[in-house]
Amino acid sequence: MPKVRTKDLIEQFQLELISGEEGIHRPIDTSDLSRPGIEMAGFFTYYPADRVQLLGKTELTFFDTLTSEQKQERMKALCTEETPCIIVTRNQDVPDELLQASRESGMPLLRSSQTTTRLSSRLTNYLEGKLAPTTAVHGVLVDIYGVGVLITGQSGVGKSETALELVKRGHRLVADDSVEIRQEDEDMLVGSSPDLIEHLLEIRGLGIINVMTLFGAGAVRNYKRITLVINLEIWDQKKNYDRLGLDEEKMKIIDTELTKITLPVRPGRNLAVIIEVAAMNFRLKRMGVNAAQQFSERLMSAIELGNQE
């Protein structure tokens, strides 16, 4: 099922429906828009009929120069069964030929008071967000010092309890248990919570709590870009864990690779503080300050100096 239909654009952007009401449930499957200027001149070989069509001042001014026969021909060619809608911008008058073609084809004809450039930008941003590839991940998403940290791990390892401690320390909860992730752009993942469990946190033995009610509106966020993954796992004595931080592990979600840190869990470890420091250290690395790399370089210099002596 398509995620966006023409009626969604009408509601989102307060568009005026001129005609073609029977077609407002037409699907929109691409975020690309079309301004059919070359089509107005009669070239329809590569006409992208499946896109939302925008008619601005330039297109309609040129349209006025055509003969009556050409006007009818061009508008019939524009209004296809595939076309989600045609939007006339700047509250311009709708040509009679376009109105007639819309009625005959059942294609929605809409009008907006916004300029073509402004409406085009807003439509593109809206459609890219709605049509972006999506997935769901079992975990907790928290905004820590501006870093979107996705905490993963097997059930019962302590993800929600750690998130609760982070919220108490002033950070913001985005989602618990199920994180809906959409790829809004290349290398850009945005996580949010399903509407049903938004702002809720499940603590074993305590039950479900409403974080916004308990800690205030400043303790939650509706969405956050994900830049770091921290995986919690029960401490395995046979496994060698990274002790320097030189090797950077990656995790792929949809088509984006994220930095992943594995934290072993055992009694006595304050996971909330460790995750806080991991987020701050991640920010430092992005700013060009890598403590592990600096230590490694100092160590190599000391070894070389010792060998020379």
Swiss-Prot record:
GO cellular component: cytosol
EC identifiers of the protein: 2.7.11.-, 2.7.4.-
Enzyme type, top EC level: transferase
Span list, region Important for the catalytic mechanism of dephosphorylation: 264-269
Residues annotated as catalytic: H138, K159, D177, R243
Keyword Kinase appears in the UniProt entry: yes
Binding site for ATP: G153, Q154, S155, G156, V157, G158, K159, S160
GO BP, one annotated term: regulation of carbohydrate metabolic process
Catalytic activity from the UniProt record: [HPr protein]-L-serine + ATP = [HPr protein]-O-phospho-L-serine + ADP + H(+); [HPr protein]-O-phospho-L-serine + phosphate + H(+) = [HPr protein]-L-serine + diphosphate
UniProt keyword list: ATP-binding, Carbohydrate metabolism, Kinase, Magnesium, Metal-binding, Multifunctional enzyme, Nucleotide-binding, Serine/threonine-protein kinase, Transferase
Residues bound to Mg(2+): S160, E202
Cofactor(s) essential for the protein: Mg(2+)
InterPro entries, per database record: HPr(Ser)_kin/Pase (IPR003755), Hpr_kin/Pase_C (IPR011104), Hpr_kin/Pase_Hpr_N (IPR011126), P-loop_NTPase (IPR027417), Ser_kin/Pase_Hpr-like_N_sf (IPR028979)
Self-association state and partner proteins as the record states: Homohexamer.
Extra remark beyond the main annotation: Both phosphorylation and phosphorolysis are carried out by the same active site and suggest a common mechanism for both reactions.
Comment on protein domains: The Walker A ATP-binding motif also binds Pi and PPi.
Family: Belongs to the HPrK/P family.
Full protein name: HPr kinase/phosphorylase
Species per Swiss-Prot/TrEMBL record: Bacillus cereus (strain ATCC 14579 / DSM 31 / CCUG 7414 / JCM 2152 / NBRC 15305 / NCIMB 9373 / NCTC 2599 / NRRL B-3711)
Designated gene of the protein: hprK
